[in-house]
């Protein structure tokens, strides 16, 4: 059981979720008709900015003994990586603007930035689940694509699958003892509200 929980926690690491989100947009929305090479280039750049760079920083902080745990399970050690991740996400948003991405794609990144800022602020007095925030953001993104008529095909099955995965990820965090039910639920709310509002405001 613990191995399954660890699997879900690793596969849906918060640093991977922006890449998953951009992948979904590029492959299930009307943008799927763009050349594959162009889509892969955007995806790889987003992966580098929002995943590789923060991972390198976390490794450096760990080697410098500024943080004691690469998994950032200690609340007090999360704020520096959160701030750096926010800067990386801002860079990713401006990259999407630079390549003339639709406003509703850039909105996803601004929503992700907002969710990190909320998590960072809350982190000073309570621990909120970043995993739950990220996976709930994907659910909100898919709902937005569906409601705005931007999906290239019927994605209700994908929305349902993502909701199930969100439940699995949240349950995994609780099973591993990293979060309470309240912290996971707060993460869900954070992800859904930030991404959905960003899509409404910027689209």
Feature locations, PLM:
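Membrane-interface helix termini and inter-helical loops of multi-pass transporters
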Residues: 29-38, 67-70, 98-102, 149-151, ...
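Cytosolic, membrane-interface loops and tails of multi-pass inner-membrane proteins
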Residues: 59-72
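Juxtamembrane helix-capping/reentrant segments at transmembrane boundaries
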Residues: 8, 69-84
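Membrane-embedded catalytic cores of phosphoryl/pyrophosphoryl-handling enzymes
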Residues: 99, 104-203
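Short, Lys/Arg-rich, polar N-terminal cytosolic tail immediately upstream
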Residues: 1-6
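The first (N-terminal) embedded transmembrane alpha-helix
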Residues: 9-29
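Core segments of transmembrane alpha-helices
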Residues: 84-93, 134-139
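Loop-to-helix transition at the N-terminal end of transmembrane alpha-helices
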Residues: 36-52, 75-76, 188
């Amino acid at each position: 059981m613990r191995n399954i929980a660890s699997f879900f926690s690793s596969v849906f690491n918060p640093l991977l979720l922006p890449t998953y989100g951009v992948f979904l947009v590029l492959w299930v929305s009307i943008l799927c008709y763009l050349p594959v090479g162009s889509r892969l280039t955007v995806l790889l750049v987003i992966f580098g900015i929002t995943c590789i760079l923060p991972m390198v920083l976390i490794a450096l902080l760990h080697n410098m003994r500024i943080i004691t745990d690469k998994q950032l399970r200690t609340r007090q050690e999360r704020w520096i990586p959160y701030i750096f991740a926010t800067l990386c996400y801002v860079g990713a948003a401006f990259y999407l603007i630079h390549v003339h991405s639709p406003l509703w794609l850039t909105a996803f990144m601004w929503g992700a930035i907002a969710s990190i800022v909320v998590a960072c602020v809350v982190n000073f007095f309570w621990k909120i689940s970043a995993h739950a925030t990220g996976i709930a953001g994907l659910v909100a993104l898919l709902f937005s694509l569906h409601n705005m008529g931007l999906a290239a095909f019927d994605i209700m099955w994908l929305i349902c699958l993502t909701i199930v995965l969100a439940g699995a990820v949240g349950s995994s965090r609780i099973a591993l003892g990293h979060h309470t039910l309240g912290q996971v639920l707060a993460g869900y709310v954070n992800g859904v509200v930030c991404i959905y509002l960003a899509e409404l405001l910027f689209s």
